[in-house]
Amino acid sequence: GSAGSAAATRLSEDPQRSVLLLEAGPDYPDFETLPDELKFGYATGTDIMVSDEHNWQFTGKANEIAETMLVPRGRVTGGTSAINGQVFLRGLTDDFNDWSSEGNKLWTFEEGLPFFRDLETDMDFHDDFHGSGGPIICHRFKRDDWLPSQTAFYSACIEAGFPAVADFNQPDSHGVGAIPCNNPNGIRFSTALGYLAQARHRVNFTIKSNCLARRLLFNDLSVTGVEVESGGESFVVEGEQIVLSSGTIANAQLLMLSGIGPSDHLQEMGIDLVLDLPGVG
């Protein structure tokens, strides 16, 4: 997942920790070795969508009668941030506050704002809501650079009464305007570029690519290791602490393969139950 690169980089800042990052897909150790479809934000979507080298090629349906659609998920260091459309929008303020109201006061938008600021360098805005020294570079296309269709859409929205928005990452903004993007000079600035690049030289940090996590290993309800497959061989990786950061879909998938999830579904799939947790998946 995209967050795995950030978590591993931050954890390895402590030289007393030994950090291992397992990646199911390939890893590219420097910018020059990145394939063009990952490097450039305006590469054709076909390359990424068709190839399974960097994309899990998941599909899904919105409902029973809808047509099957692609659900692109990154299979490379940087996760889906390495193949996505580089839209750098924060979540809605009300969503964060709704989550917090369920019991965790640290999930409010106000509590999360310092982390949003820390992860970005915003090229356009320099105020209390934006960062200036973070690893991910953010910008907005100027009106002179818009396509004719974008200019026409903007003008039509203004004529229809929608307010103009200069910054969609400003809390409570709504209307029409340029979206923030993390693709300076056309480069897709993934978390692999923004975070991992600064950590690769650390002696306490190791990246192992093409290592697929098959399941988590437990001692009672404590995770002690991961069963991994690589090059047709299986082996176990153990650690004092295991951080699961496999993305929106694979996190739930790996938990269920490991026996954590709704008991009836796990039983149906022939998976031994570790913990009945209906919310998983």
PLM segments and residue spans:
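N-terminal redox-cofactor-binding region of secreted/periplasmic oxidoreductases
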Residues: 1-281
